[in-house]
Design a protein with these regions (language model features):
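N-terminal, intrinsically disordered, highly charged
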Residues: 1-266, 271-278, 282-284, 289-290, ...
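Short, flexible helix-loop junctions that flank or precede catalytic/ligand sites
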Residues: 164-550
C-alpha cells in the first residue's frame, strides 16, 4: 500500500531493481500470515539490510538519514531529554536549532518516541533515521552501557529493597545476561563493594564497567543467580560452581557460574559459552596461509601428539575445538577429557574431570584408551603422569591433542624434558607445538594509517630506519570509542624435524631449539604480529603489550 499517496516501498524496490515481482509477492504473503511492516519482511528475507531500508524510507517519507558515527552531539543537546526516556524509547537528540529538535529514531513510522520527545522538551521535533546498531552504540557512548532503569526517582526515605521485588530482580538478572551477549562479552563480573554492586563485562579481553547497582539488593541478586545455576542459596561462606542454560532472542547461551565469598558479600563470575563462537575456521582465528597449511598437514596421519601452548585466556581451547571440528568424521571416534567442558561439540564424546569422584586427567586418559579412540583431546597436561600417558597413547596409534603453559613453542619441548619424559619418546611422538596469543583487532570503521615511531619500532625489534606502516583505531560509535572490535590470534608453529629431534635427544636448551625452528622457516609470534600490524589487523601497542619487548 502506498503511504500518504506516495509510491509504496515494494514499488520502489522493483523500480530500482532490488527485487522482482515474484519476490514482492512472497513478501506480501508473509505479511498476510504475520501482519506487520513490509520493510521488516524485506529485511527478514534478505532483500535489503537496515541501512538500505532507511535510505528507501528516507526517499519515500522525505525524512533525512544520518550516520551517527560521523556526528558529535553537544552535551547541552543530550541534556534536553532525560536518560530514562532516551533508553526506553530508543531515541537520541542530535541537534537543536531555535525551537526545533532533530531526533534520531530507528522507525520513523512509529509516532510514540517522537511524541515522548515532544512532551519532554516542549519543542518541535523533526526525526532523522538511523540504524538500530548506531543508536545503541551512541547511547552506550554518551550515557554508558547499562540499559536497566535506575532508581533515580526514589526519595531519600525510600527503602531501596522495596523497589526491587522478586519480579524486578529476575528482570534485572536477565537484562544483565542479555546485554552481555550484545557486547560479545566473554565474562560477567558481579562484585559487591562497600557502597554498591559493580557489574563489569570482559570485552575483547578487557574488563569494562557496565553498571552500578544498590548494595541493598546484593543478597537478592546473588540468590537469583544461584537459583538459575542450581546452587545452594543458603551457602554463602564457601565457593560454589554452577551452570545456567539461558534462552534469549539470540539463541541458547551456556553460562558457567562461580561464586566466591569476599569482604562485602559473594562475588560472582559468569563465563559465557557460545558454540558458534568456538567453531571458527583456522583463517578466521588468524592463521596466515603458510602456517595454516603446515598445521593442517601436521594433522594428517593417525598418530602423534600436537600441543598448543600459551597463557590462560589466549584461545588455546578455541583452537583445539576448531581443529576437532575439522577432523570430525563418521568413520573416526573422537574422545576428550576436559576441566571443564567449555562447549558441547556435536559428534564428539566429551568427559569432564571430577577429582571428588577420582576422575583426573591421568585416570580418565587410561579409561579413554579402552574406548577405541582415534583422536584424543586432553584439556591440559599438568603433571608428569598425564604427559607420559598422552605420549604413550600417541605411540600406540592415536592422534593426541593437548595444551601446555609455556611462553613460546620451543620452551614447550623443554617443559616436557623437565617433566622427566624420556627424550626419545618426545622426539618420536610430538609432531609440533603451536604457540599463540590473542590481540585486539582494530575497528574497521575508524582505522587510520600512520608511520610507527622509532620507539615503537625498537620495542618490536626493528631499527629506526626500518619502514613500518601501522594503523590504529581513532574511536567511533561502532567500537564505543575504544578503537578496537574483536580479537585475532598470532601464532608460532614449531614442527618436529631431524635437527630438532637431535636437540631434544641431547636435552638442548629452549633457545637452541627455537633457533633451529627459525632456521627451518618457523614464523615467530613477533613476526606474525608484525604481519598483522602491517595489514592493519592490530596495533603496535597490542603486539608489544602482549608479547613484551623483542
Amino acid at each position: 500500500m502506498a503511504l500518504g499517496g506516495k509510491q509504496s516501498l515494494g514499488q520502489m524496490l522493483i523500480k530500482s531493481g532490488k527485487i522482482d515481482d515474484e519476490q514482492l509477492d512472497k513478501a506480501l504473503e508473509m505479511l498476510q500470515e504475520n501482519p506487520g511492516y513490509i520493510g521488516s519482511v524485506f529485511q527478514e528475507l534478505g532483500y535489503l539490510n537496515e541501512r538500505e531500508l532507511n535510505q528507501y524510507l528516507s526517499q519515500q517519507l522525505r525524512i533525512p538519514t544520518l550516520s551517527l558515527g560521523n556526528y558529535e552531539i553537544q552535551k547541552t543537546v543530550l541534556e534536553l531529554i532525560p536518560e530514562r526516556i532516551i533508553r526506553a524509547q530508543k531515541i537520541l537528540p542530535v541537534f537543536k536549532l531555535n525551537n526545533t529538535l532533530n531526533l534520531a529514531v530507528t522507525d520513523p513510522l512509529d509516532s510514540t518516541p517522537i511524541n515522548a520527545a515532544r512532551q519532554a522538551t516542549g519543542m518541535k521535533v523533526d526525526p532523522v533515521i538511523v540504524t538500530s546498531t548506531e543508536i545503541d552504540n551512541a547511547i552506550d557512548l554518551y550515557y554508558g552501557m547499562s540499559t536497566f532503569v535506575d532508581v533515580e526517582d526514589a526519595s531519600e526515605t525510600t527503602n531501596i529493597s522495596d523497589l526491587f521485588d522478586e519480579t524486578r530482580i529476575v528482570e534485572l538478572m536477565d537484562s544483565i545476561i542479555t546485554q552481555s551477549q550484545r557486547y560479545n562479552s566473554s565474562d560477567i563480573h558481579i562484585e559487591p563493594r562497600e557502597t554498591d554492586i559493580r557489574i563489569r563485562f570482559r570485552i575483547d579481553g578487557r574488563l569494562q564497567d557496565f553498571q552500578a547497582l544498590p548494595k541493598e539488593i546484593s543478597t537478592a541478586l546473588i540468590s537469583r543467580l544461584k537459583i538459575m545455576a542450581n546452587m545452594d542459596i543458603a551457602e554463602t561462606r564457601r565457593p560454589q560452581d554452577g551452570r545456567i542454560l539461558f534462552k534469549s532472542k539470540s539463541g541458547r547461551l551456556d553460562l558457567r557460574v562461580s561464586t566466591y565469598p569476599t569482604l562485602y558479600g559473594e562475588k560472582c563470575v559468569m563465563r559465557l559459552l557460545n558454540i558458534s563462537e568456538a567453531l571458527h575456521s583456522l583463517v578466521d582465528l588468524g592463521f596466515e596461509e603458510e602456517v595454516q597449511g603446515k598445521y593442517t598437514d601436521m594433522l594428517i596421519g593417525n598418530q602423534g601428539i600436537v600441543l598448543v601452548s600459551g597463557p590462560t585466556g589466549c584461545g588455546k581451547t578455541t583452537t583445539l575445538y576448531s581443529t576437532l571440528n575439522r577432523l570430525e568424521s563418521p568413520d573416526i571416534n573422537i574422545v576428550t577429557i576436559e576441566d571443564p567442558i567449555e562447549y558441547d561439540l556435536p559428534n564428539v564424546n566429551q568427559a569432564q574431570v571430577n577429582i571428588k569422584s577420582g576422575v583426573s586427567f591421568a585416570s580418565a586418559l587410561r579409561s579413554i584408551l579402552r574406548q577405541d579412540p582415534d583422536v584424543i583431546m586432553v584439556g591440559e597436561v599438568r603433571d608428569e603422569e598425564t604427559v607420559e600417558l598422552a605420549i604413550r597413547a600417541a605411540l600406540t596409534g592415536h592422534l593426541v591433542f593437548s595444551t601446555i603453559h609455556t611462553n613460546d613453542a620451543a620452551t614447550g619441548f623443554t617443559r616436557l624434558l623437565n617433566w622427566k619424559v624420556e627424550p626419545f619418546l618426545i622426539s618420536s611422538t610430538v609432531k609440533g607445538i603451536l604457540a599463540q596469543r590473542l590481540v585486539r583487532r582494530i575497528c574497521p570503521e575508524c582505522r587510520v594509517e600512520y608511520q610507527a615511531t622509532n620507539q615503537e619500532k625498537l620495542q618490536l625489534g626493528l631499527e629506526p630506519e626500518d619502514d613500518l606502516i601501522s594503523y590504529l583505531g581513532g574511536g567511533c560509535l561502532a567500537c564505543r570509542n575504544t578503537g578496537y572490535k574483536g580479537r585475532i590470534g598470532i601464532y608460532e608453529l614449531l614442527l618436529m624435524n631431524q635437527t630438532i629431534s637431535e636437540l631434544v635427544l641431547n636435552n638442548a636448551p629452549g633457545y637452541r631449539i627455537r633457533d633451529a625452528g627459525v632456521d627451518a622457516g618457523m614464523v615467530t609470534l613477533l613476526q606474525d604480529g608484525l604481519t598483522k600490524i602491517r595489514r592493519g589487523d592490530t596495533t603496535t601497542k597490542e603486539v608489544y603489550e602482549t608479547l613484551g619487548a623483542a
